[in-house]
Every structure is written in structure tokens, then in C-alpha cells.
From Swiss-Prot:
Its EC number is 3.6.4.-. Residues 158-228 are annotated as: Small ATPAse domain (RuvB-S). This is Holliday junction branch migration complex subunit RuvB. The gene is ruvB. It comes from Thermosipho melanesiensis (strain DSM 12029 / CIP 104789 / BI429). InterPro entries: AAA+_ATPase, AAA_lid_4, CbxX/CfxQ, DNA_helicase_Holl-junc_RuvB, P-loop_NTPase, RuvB-like_N, RuvB_C, WH-like_DNA-bd_sf. GO terms for biological process: DNA recombination; DNA repair. One of its GO terms (molecular function) is four-way junction helicase activity.
Length: 313
């Protein structure tokens, strides 16, 4: 846990809960990890398992199609094991129901047979910890959400945290990187470790081809230009989203369905991948009527702000 960079508050809360559960020799409370893709939810799930000294069983919401799929996993868990369900918000509601008694009472009811002769059998489970990961906690049903004792909202990472992650990853990748280059790479990574590591690998490719021993700031700048990533970390699709809101919908408001259709990507991609960072960075704002482009978005794209549009600010 101490080696995990970033998410300081979450690490403290988890560390306290894990230590207490180990003293009591009880299963850790169920944990829900919430945040945009690439912030380390899966990594945290594995760290929880490692800190508890138990096994982790990994699955995802979309592939759990029948109650029997969940029952098969639950009955194979040992005391204190961690069951990690990624994209838990995409789990079938009928499948979700079997988790209610499993999470609360460590029991499940299985229906044997069909028709009038069918009977229900209650099976006791070993105490376990369910760790769910979601990019959209609002899509979880209230009964499921309420059964999580620990709900952790992951934040975007700071430049300093990302640069440390990049420097550590560079050692693993057997490549040297200058401090300034790591900081620049961090600034273009949208506050997301997964993106930072992906960009580092692309810069490493150029370093390999050119036979350079160390990655410098000029190499990072060149790769960012090739990838179309600007100083704010926005790529072509980010800018297309902003430009569409401004030019097609006169700055907004616009609903996610209309915006997705205009840009040519799915609603989920807008909501889960692009919108969180654009909101966090102040390029868009969300109102009850839809998304609107902010003055920062106009300035970033070099588009003249309509007279009177932001006068109230």
C-alpha cells in the first residue's frame, strides 16, 4: 500500500479498515471503487488482496449473465478472499440480486428444479470481501450500493504524482528520462496514470529508434505533436467534442445523446472517458439542460466568444 503513488486519503481509509479487519480476524467490509478509467481501481483491488494476505478472484459485470455464474464463483471463495468485479454497474439486475444476501449474510439461495417441484436451498458462504469498480456509480441500484461499507471516489492525479509514476515506470522499462521530460509528460496525461504510461511507451519507441540513451523534453514535445496532444492534454477527439458544442450547438446546452451522435462516438465514451476530464479541467460545465462549453474552451480553441455570453462572470 505504501508503494502505491497517489490517492492519499483513500490509502489512509483503506489502511485503517484493513488493519482493523485483520485484528478482528473478520472479512474486510465490501469496497466500491469509483472513478474514470485508468485511475488505478484494478491495481487497488489487487493491493487490498495483498494487504489482507488472501486470494483475489477477478471477473467483470458484463460476463456475469446468469445467477449461476455468480453462485459458482461465490461458493468457491475461501475465508477472507477478495472478489473483484470490474464494471459492476453493467451487471444484469437479476444477477445482481443474488449478491444482496451474499454480501449481507454470506448466504445464497439456489433454486433446484423447475415448476411446482422446484425448491430453494440456502447455502452458507465463507466470509469474503467484494470489491466493485465502476466508472458510473449512479447506474448502480440503491440496494447494491447500500451494501458497500466503504465507497472510495478516486481523484485525478497531480502532476507531481504522475511524474513519480512515470519515473518509476521508466526504470521498469529500462529507459532513462530527464526530470523535466517526466514533468512535461505528466502535464499531458490528463491526470491519469494509464495515459501517462501509454505516452511513456510511445516516447520510448522514438528513443529506441533514434538510439538515444535518455528521453529529453524535446523528444516528448515531438511525440505529443505527432499524437495531436496539446498543452492541456487534450487530443483530437477532445477538441472535436468542444468544437461541436460551440459550433454546432452554439456553446450548449446539449444532451449527451445528441453530442455523441454529432461527434460519432458512443454515449458511454462521452460520459466515461472524455467528459470527466473536460469537466475537471473546466472546459465544459454540466447543467440540468445539458453540457455547455466554458470560456476556457473558447479561448483554448481560439474561437471568439459571442458578445454577452459570459458577461455574468
Amino acid at each position: 500500500m505504501n508503494e502505491y503513488i497517489g490517492q492519499g486519503n483513500i490509502k489512509k481509509r483503506l489502511g485503517l479498515a484493513i488493519k482493523a479487519s485483520k485484528i478482528r480476524k473478520e472479512a474486510l467490509d465490501h469496497v466500491l471503487l469509483v472513478g474514470p478509467p485508468g485511475l488505478g481501481k484494478t491495481t487497488l483491488a489487487h493491493i487490498i488482496s495483498n494487504e489482507l494476505g488472501t486470494n483475489i478472484h477477478v471477473t467483470s459485470g458484463p460476463i456475469l449473465e446468469k445467477q449461476g455464474d455468480v453462485a459458482a464463483i461465490l461458493t468457491n471463495l475461501e475465508h477472507g478472499d477478495v472478489l473483484f468485479i470490474d464494471e459492476i454497474h453493467r451487471m444484469n439486475r437479476s444477477v445482481e440480486e443474488i449478491l444482496y444476501t451474499a454480501m449481507e449474510d454470506f448466504q445464497i439461495d439456489i433454486l433446484i428444479g423447475k415448476g411446482p417441484s422446484a425448491r430453494s436451498i440456502r447455502i452458507d458462504l465463507q466470509p469474503f470481501t467484494l470489491v466493485g469498480a465502476t466508472t458510473r456509480s449512479g447506474l448502480l441500484s440503491a440496494p447494491l450500493r447500500n451494501r458497500f461499507g466503504l465507497i472510495m471516489e478516486l481523484d485525478f492525479y497531480s502532476i507531481d504524482e504522475l511524474s513519480k509514476i512515470i519515473e518509476r515506470a521508466a526504470i521498469v522499462l529500462n529507459v532513462e528520462i530527464e526530470k523535466d521530460a517526466a514533468i512535461l509528460l505528466a502535464k499531458r496525461s490528463r491526470g491519469t496514470p494509464r495515459i501517462a504510461l501509454r505516452l511513456l511507451r510511445r516516447v520510448r519507441d522514438m528513443s529506441t529508434i533514434r538510439g538515444k540513451v535518455k528521453i529529453d523534453i524535446y523528444m516528448v514535445e515531438e511525440i505529443m505533436f505527432l499524437l495531436g496532444i496539446d498543452k492541456e492534454g487534450l487530443d483530437e477527439l477532445d477538441r472535436k467534442i468542444l468544437r461541436t458544442i460551440i459550433e454546432v450547438y452554439n456553446g450548449g446546452p446539449v444532451g449527451v445523446k445528441s453530442l455523441a451522435a454529432s461527434v460519432g462516438i458512443s454515449e458511454d465514451s462521452i460520459s466515461e472517458v472524455y467528459e470527466p476530464y473536460l469537466l475537471q479541467s473546466g472546459f465544459i460545465a454540466r447543467t440540468h439542460r445539458g453540457r455547455i462549453a466554458t470560456k476556457k474552451a473558447y479561448n483554448h480553441l481560439g474561437i471568439k466568444v459571442q458578445r454577452g455570453l459570459f458577461d455574468e462572470e
